[in-house]
Amino acid sequence: MTDTQLVARAQAGDLPAFEDLVKKYQREIYGLACRMVSDPEEAKDLAQQTFLQAFVHLRSFRQDAQFRTWIFRIAINQCYNFLKSRKRFGDPVDCDEVVLVGEDDTPEEELISQDERRRVYAALKKLPPKQQAVLTLKVDQGLSYQEISEVLGGTPGAARVNYCQALKTLKKYLRSEEDEVAMHPSPALATRVSRR
């Protein structure tokens, strides 16, 4: 069943139709929240709040918009409100433990991949919230610039500019971290290198 059909049924009072929408989007909404707030427990709460808000305001949803865009907008607003109220940008957490490593990777390759993910998440947390959101929506969720502009407001051109700025800033953070590591290697790394 399509989102349009599920929304129409849910707006008519069909609770199982809304539950189907929740099942369809819960992983994406949780992943988005987790990347924005860096706390798996808070992300779960924010995902639940997102679906609660969607349920409460479902009758005001207009079918001329996409449900996916609308629910992402609610999730982004929930995350922004959380970040504003708590004024915190915690340490990055690999929230949903999505395995990005191939099945044939060696333990060394898997360790490097996990370390790279942690570095990227740490750099991502340094970005302004809007750039975090644009990058997450584009890369993780695969939204187009048009869809991002519908979720965050603004134009597709502004979404593209924010995305490009976010990538540029992210690269700068990652390069500066690499330079820092090269200038001040960890004692464990220095010990491993000296043994060879």
For each predicted feature, which ranges?
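C-terminal edge and immediately downstream basic/flexible tail or linker adjoining helix-turn-helix-like DNA-binding
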Residues: 9, 91, 122, 146-153, ...
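DNA-recognition helix of helix-turn-helix
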Residues: 69, 76, 80, 131, ...
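Short, charged helix-capping/linker segments at alpha-helix termini
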Residues: 11-20, 30-49, 156, 176-180
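Internal acidic/polar
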Residues: 89-113, 188-191
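Sigma70-family region 2
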Residues: 11-12, 38, 51-66, 85-87
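Amphipathic alpha-helical segment used for protein-protein interaction
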Residues: 8, 12-15, 87, 103-136, ...
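Arg/Lys-rich amphipathic alpha helix in sigma70-family domain 2
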Residues: 59-63, 73-93, 113, 165
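Structural recognition of an alpha-helix C-terminal capping motif at a helix-to-coil junction
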Residues: 31, 45-52, 65-77
